[in-house]
Amino acid sequence: MKPPSGLEEAQRRQASDIRVFANSCTMHGLGHIFGPGGLTLRRGLWATAVLLSLAAFLYQVAERVRYYGEFHHKTTLDERESHQLTFPAVTLCNINPLRRSRLTPNDLHWAGTALLGLDPAEHAAYLRALGQPPAPPGFMPSPTFDMAQLYARAGHSLEDMLLDCRYRGQPCGPENFTVIFTRMGQCYTFNSGAQGAELLTTPKGGAGNGLEIMLDVQQEEYLPIWKDMEETPFEVGIRVQIHGQEEPPAIDQLGFGAAPGHQTFVSCQQQQLSFLPPPWGDCNTASVDPDFDPEPSDPLGSPSSSPPYSLIGCRLACESRYVARKCGCRMMHMPGNSPVCSPQQYKDCASPALDAMLRKDTCVCPNPCATTRYAKELSMVRIPSRASARYLARKYNRSETYITENVLVLDIFFEALNYEAVEQKAAYEVSELLGDIGGQMGLFIGASLLTILEILDYLCEVFQDRVLGYFWNRRSSQRRSGNTLLQEELNGHRTHVPHLSLGPRPPTAPSAVTKTLAASHRTCYLVTRL
């Protein structure tokens, strides 16, 4: 870098002068502090005011930065309209898990103690209570037993329960339902979207624009209560859960009941929930558990593609791994590759382990970043009326008493063709942080972004003057010192030149060599080397 000339150095020193900068800076108050003249009371007051304003500004900036670092969020609720809505999945389970007419002596041998609390000596009496003959002499139980096959064979069949089905006025049937295993046994899901089936939609709200089904709960197939056990059902009817297609049902925890002898109206409203990921929230699209790997819950079905992440699915996979580690098997409604637990494993290990785990709530499952829920309002009326009882009895070849005690109607529909959008949003964005800092800067010190650039420019001038100027001055001093030494050497040679004879000289040989030691416009000193 070329060292500055005298004029450039003077200009640079003027630019780095604090008084010059204070008079030209757009920051308020500096001109009153660093103006010409000595220290006065007025200048001291201005300095105090500027320092207090600067301290207040820095405090506000620190508070705003701290608040931004806490990553607060806000929740907004918006009512939105839609031309059509996807109809939810509807899962149905009969409260009675097994039909009495389908139980065999082999079933009681394997599952009687675990499921019904029966002692082996009570099997014959229980079979008589079921209206079935006792085990024949020489009865030999099967060497193995599969709980999933028991529920698939002895559970209530939808073909027998479903008396009538209509979706938006169009007939539907058992083929529109998908078999799924839950903790309540074999259940059925309408509009599940399984196997890539197209999801049903509705363009209208209100009754008659959704699913309407008539069911026979088959109360005569309910198992007799032999002993009071922990999960003994005393009610009659079905359990219903309305949920999104992306999550498996948890009907034993989230389902509501529908009783025979009533028509239950379920008015739904779709809620689309959107959560924020860290650091503003805790949502995730995958479980924080690295072992999370959702698999189909149908123990009799073939594996299919993994469903999207959901809170219920994550908990179900977590419970399955816990039971598999504790018992070496899994319950029939759980995903995984472990074998299904035997009835004795259900009683001695799986059910107690699962209940203990649910009490501790040890599964780490964050909320999904996007999910769909359905708010419900239930109302009901008694059926059948006196006018319709005889007609229904004749139509289904049943007595009027049977119709009253076993038949129910379930009507599920959207209240209106709109949905609620519940969204989490960052409560304090970067733009708001910059806006607050800019506002505080203008309020307290009368500065802006350009003022900061002015200060940076001044600091560059100071650096160039004080730091780089120091090295330039040092280099110039070294150069001047070198020139002084050279001049002294030349002066030394000049002092020896007068001892030479300046009178007439003998002629020199032509081969002589002369060297000029010093020259000027007046004289030239020569040293002759012979």
From Swiss-Prot:
Entry GO terms, CC: cytoplasm; plasma membrane
Any Pfam family the entry gives: ASC
Keyword presence, Transmembrane helix: yes
Major location (coarse): membrane
TM segment ranges: 44-62, 441-460
Annotated disulfide bonds: C93-C187, C165-C172, C283-C369, C314-C365, C318-C363, C327-C349, C329-C341
Record GO biological process: detection of chemical stimulus involved in sensory perception; detection of chemical stimulus involved in sensory perception of pain; detection of mechanical stimulus involved in sensory perception; detection of mechanical stimulus involved in sensory perception of pain; detection of temperature stimulus involved in sensory perception; detection of temperature stimulus involved in sensory perception of pain; establishment of localization in cell; membrane depolarization
Motif stretch (GAS motif): 446-448
Record comment: activity regulation: Inhibited by the diuretic drug amiloride. Potentiated by FMRFamide-related neuropeptides, which are induced during inflammation and modulate pain responses.
Alphabetized UniProt keyword annotations: Cell membrane, Cytoplasm, Disulfide bond, Glycoprotein, Ion channel, Ion transport, Membrane, Phosphoprotein, Sodium, Sodium channel, Sodium transport, Transmembrane, Transmembrane helix, Transport
Residues with glycosylation annotation: N176, N397
Expression by tissue: Expressed in liver, lung, kidney, testis, brain, eye and cochlea. Expressed in spiral ganglion and sensory hair cells of the organ of Corti in the cochlea (at protein level). Expressed in dorsal root ganglion innervating muscles and spinal cord. Expressed in peripheral sensory nerve terminals like nerves of the Meissner corpuscle, palisades of lanceolate nerve endings, site of mechanoreception in guard hair follicles, and Merkel cell-neurite complexes.
Localisation per UniProt entry: Cell membrane; Cytoplasm
Membrane side Extracellular: residue ranges: 63-440
Compositionally biased spans, kind Low complexity: 298-307
Cytoplasmic side: 1-43, 461-530
Catalysed transformations (reactions): Na(+)(in) = Na(+)(out); K(+)(in) = K(+)(out); Ca(2+)(in) = Ca(2+)(out)
Gene Ontology MF terms in the entry: enterobactin transmembrane transporter activity; ligand-gated sodium channel activity; monoatomic cation channel activity; pH-gated sodium channel activity
Quaternary context: Can form homotrimeric channels. Heterotrimer; forms functional heterotrimers producing channel with different properties. Forms heterotrimers with ASIC2; gives rise to a biphasic current with a sustained current which discriminates poorly between Na(+) and K(+). Interacts with STOM; inhibits ASIC3 acid-evoked current. Interacts with LIN7B (via PDZ domain); increases ASIC3 expression at the plasma membrane. Interacts with MAGI1 (via PDZ domain); probably regulates ASIC3. Interacts with GOPC (via PDZ domain); probably regulates ASIC3.
Main function: Forms voltage-independent, pH-gated heterotrimeric sodium channels that act as postsynaptic excitatory receptors in the nervous system. Upon extracellular acidification, these channels generate a biphasic current with a fast inactivating and a slow sustained phase. ASIC3 is more sensitive to protons and gates between closed, open, and desensitized states faster than other ASICs. Displays high selectivity for sodium ions but can also permit the permeation of other cations. As a neuronal acid sensor, probably contributes to mechanoreception, acid nociception, and heat nociception.
Record remark: domains: The PDZ-binding motif mediates the interaction with PDZ-domain containing proteins including DLG4, GOPC, MAGI1 and LIN7A.
Name this polypeptide is given: Acid-sensing ion channel 3
Source taxonomy: Eukaryota, Metazoa, Chordata, Craniata, Vertebrata
